[in-house]
């Protein structure tokens, strides 16, 4: 029988073994059950910044609660602007405020900033080199709501935009450190945001965020995992599991995607005999992996092998995050299995 063009292919239809999904399952935190977290780190950090800098204002496209800007709204109601579901207006308003000497912090979902408002960010903010900070929740595969909400290609879109700095923090402490750092940077910034109860990961490594700098969190002789955002948390977990299997894995955290810390990346990749793996919460097209690969190709540095772990060049399914992360290979278990397979080649 000929299938209707509106009928989903069989391989995309859920089977009886799949759990029934609830709304709470689809917006669950990325933190593990026993993992320490900190609530709304961006909202608290921006509120603290505003206490010291009266230029700071916050703008939302009807998503203050879901980008943690509600904390700022409660602390500074006279400096909060609700623009409604109008992302183009959101960006143009921020541009106008920046021209008047304010420092606007714009929040929405990453899909809406990259897909709906790209032209306005490009021409009204980036071309004019205005001091606007665009902070966007739900980067990559951090929601189960499907392609309409999963910003799997945002870095690919924004990497080519001149003047724009791109940040992908790993945890709550790094978000708190990144806010004053990018406030001190004059010019447009795009920051991917982990929201809600955000894991605490980096404090035990004595880590301090520096704009434009990559940091080696863990050394390893067998393989080097280069990562950003939540994938640094996964990379550290994977490195510990690999250690139990006799595999020594290093982790290089790259929170600034643009400008890329090429010197540190090349220095680490130059060490002989190591498999280099780039792990990212983003499509393998146009993100950190391809940025690192291009850096290596422009240099004389050649690692023993180079591989990517990331999301496929496809529109992703809806569902519970643990299920989706396993399905698309970015869970800790899948990362460990993939690296072991590559090392056995």
UniProtKB/Swiss-Prot annotation:
Binds 1 thiamine pyrophosphate per subunit. Keywords: Plasmid, Thiamine pyrophosphate. SMART domains: Transket_pyr (SM00861). Its cofactor is thiamine diphosphate. This is Putative uncharacterized transketolase family protein y4mN. It comes from Sinorhizobium fredii (strain NBRC 101917 / NGR234). InterPro entries: PDH/Transketolase (IPR051157), THDP-binding (IPR029061), Transketo_C/PFOR_II (IPR009014), Transketolase-like_Pyr-bd (IPR005475), Transketolase_C (IPR033248). Pfam families: Transket_pyr (PF02779), Transketolase_C (PF02780). The keyword Repeat does not apply. It comes from the Bacteria. Belongs to the transketolase family.
């Amino acid at each position: 029988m000929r299938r209707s063009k509106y009928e989903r292919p069989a391989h995309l239809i859920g089977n009886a073994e799949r759990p029934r999904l609830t709304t709470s399952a689809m917006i669950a935190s990325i933190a593990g059950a026993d993992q320490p977290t900190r609530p709304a780190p961006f909202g608290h950090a921006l509120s603290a910044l505003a206490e010291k800098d009266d230029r700071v204002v916050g703008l939302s496209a009807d998503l203050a609660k879901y980008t943690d800007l509600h904390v700022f709204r409660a602390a500074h109601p006279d400096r909060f602007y609700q623009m409604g579901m109008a992302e183009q207006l959101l960006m143009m308003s921020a541009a106008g405020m920046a021209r008047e000497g304010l420092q606007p912090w714009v929040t929405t979902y990453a899909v809406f900033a990259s897909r709906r408002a790209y032209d306005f960010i490009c021409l009204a903010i980036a071309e004019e080199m205005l001091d606007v900070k665009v902070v966007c929740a739900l980067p990559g595969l951090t929601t189960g709501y499907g392609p309409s909400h999963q910003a799997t290609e945002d870095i690919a879109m924004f990497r080519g935009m001149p003047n724009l700095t791109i940040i992908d923090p790993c945890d709550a402490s790094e978000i708190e450190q990144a806010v004053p750092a990018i406030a001190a940077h004059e010019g447009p910034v795009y920051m991917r945001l982990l929201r809600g109860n955000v894991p605490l990961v980096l404090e035990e490594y004595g880590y301090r965020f520096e704009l434009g700098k990559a940091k080696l969190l863990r050394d390893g002789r067998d393989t080097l995992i280069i990562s950003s955002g939540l994938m640094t948390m996964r990379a550290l977990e994977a490195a510990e599991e690999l250690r139990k299997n006799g595999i020594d894995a290093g982790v290089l955290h790259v929170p600034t995607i643009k400008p890329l810390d090429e010197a540190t990346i090349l220095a680490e990749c130059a060490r002989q005999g190591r498999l280099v793996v780039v792990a990212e919460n983003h499509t393998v097209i146009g993100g950190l992996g391809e940025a690192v690969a291009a850096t290596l190709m422009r240099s004389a540095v050649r690692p023993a092998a180079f591989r990517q772990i990331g999301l496929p060049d496809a529109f992703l399914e809806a569902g519970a995050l643990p299920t989706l992360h396993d399905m698309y290979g970015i869970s800790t278990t899948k990362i460990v299995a993939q690296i072991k397979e590559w090392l056995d080649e």
